[in-house]
């Protein structure tokens, strides 16, 4: 009888331990933050970037807060930090068609494909947050690859390589 009681006690303890796993809170107000993937793929419309779904935490209308959160980097292991450490938001202005984002000069340390990917990530993120059709990106007090700014929209954010796909499948 004692052995049965001890066995039941052990089962109860194990069951309670298994039930104590911390559940991730349900996302109430999701926002998509786009980052570079750790494993590059060209099999979908995002290519080398992908969205990480995050909680707006009651700040869904506070673009400065959301972009500061975004620039702090991804939470998931399947995404890479897209921006140099120290990159912060300086200003953001939204017009009917375009959002202008100015970040600290750390961003100007990017060039070539890394700058293109980072700008694509910011563009996709900001266009979803603001519902504007293009994004102008500036680095405070410096140039980006020899230009004052980079302007992107959905047409020049295409990172999909569909050259190996059968045209009949499209």
Task: Describe the function of each predicted region.
Residues 4-9, 15, 19-170:
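Bimodal "functional hotspot" detector
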């Amino acid at each position: 009888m004692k052995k049965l009681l001890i066995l039941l006690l052990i089962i109860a303890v194990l069951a309670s331990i298994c039930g104590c796993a911390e559940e991730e809170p349900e996302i109430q107000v999701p926002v998509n933050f786009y980052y570079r993937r750790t494993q590059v793929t060209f099999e979908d419309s995002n290519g080398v970037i992908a969205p990480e779904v995050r909680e707006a935490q009651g700040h869904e209308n506070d673009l400065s807060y959301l972009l500061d959160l975004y620039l702090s980097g991804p939470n998931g292991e399947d995404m890479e930090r897209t921006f140099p450490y120290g990159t912060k938001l300086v200003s953001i202005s939204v017009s009917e068609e375009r959002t202008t984002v100015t970040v600290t000069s750390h961003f100007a340390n990017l060039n070539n494909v890394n700058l293109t990917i980072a700008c694509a990530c910011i563009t996709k993120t900001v266009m979803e947050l603001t519902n504007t059709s293009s994004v102008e990106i500036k680095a405070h007090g410096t140039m980006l690859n020899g230009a004052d700014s980079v302007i992107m929209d959905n047409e020049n954010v295409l990172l999909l390589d569909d050259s190996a796909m059968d045209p009949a499948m499209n």
